[in-house]
Amino acid sequence: MHLLPELASHHAVSIPELLVSRDERQARQHAWLKRHPVPLVSFTVVAPGPIKDSEVTRRIFNHGVTALRALAAKQGWQIQEQAALVSASGPEGMLSIAAPARDLKLATIELEHNHPLGRLWDIDVLTPEGDILSRRDYSLPPRRCLLCEQSAAVCARGKTHQLTDLLNRMEALLNDVDACNVN
């Protein structure tokens, strides 16, 4: 289920392309849930800027896939099916996991908080009925910015930081994980 970094497109995505890609992902999720009546983990990489498919985002994605598989194994949860693809919005993974949706969401939140690359992952859990379990459902604060303690959404809207600073931070986190051989 890993993606080859050397095949990244480096295509700069427009806002309309990004919106279409998100709609297509939602349609894929609902079709997937019809085939697999268990919770669905839908996993993407948080990538600032217009280039969503790069060597860096694919490497971050691959670490996430490894971490999700390890989480399922540790918990004794069966992955019934899994798939990876690249859309206009970047690397995307889907895993049908036979586990209580609430437990799955809590475990993925912990993964996002505790893994060195967790801040760069967007892990959604959908119930078999198609409802997305949100961080707000667990009274958790919004995601934090990569560079400061503000809400990531506030910094993104206000364009508080230079794109190069955000991308450099992403790459530094990835290189640290690779150097320490963290999975």
Curated annotation (Swiss-Prot):
Keywords: Nucleotidyltransferase, Transferase. It catalyses: apo-[citrate lyase ACP] + 2'-(5''-triphospho-alpha-D-ribosyl)-3'-dephospho-CoA = holo-[citrate lyase ACP] + diphosphate. Its EC number is 2.7.7.61. The keyword Nucleotide-binding does not apply. It is an enzyme of class 2 (transferase). GO terms for molecular function: holo-citrate lyase synthase activity. GO terms for biological process: prosthetic group biosynthetic process. NCBIfam families: citrate_citX, PRK01392.1. Belongs to the CitX family. Transfers 2-(5''-triphosphoribosyl)-3'-dephosphocoenzyme-A on a serine residue to the apo-acyl carrier protein (gamma chain) of the citrate lyase to yield holo-acyl carrier protein. This is Apo-citrate lyase phosphoribosyl-dephospho-CoA transferase. The lineage of its organism: Bacteria, Pseudomonadati, Pseudomonadota, Gammaproteobacteria, Enterobacterales. The gene is citX.
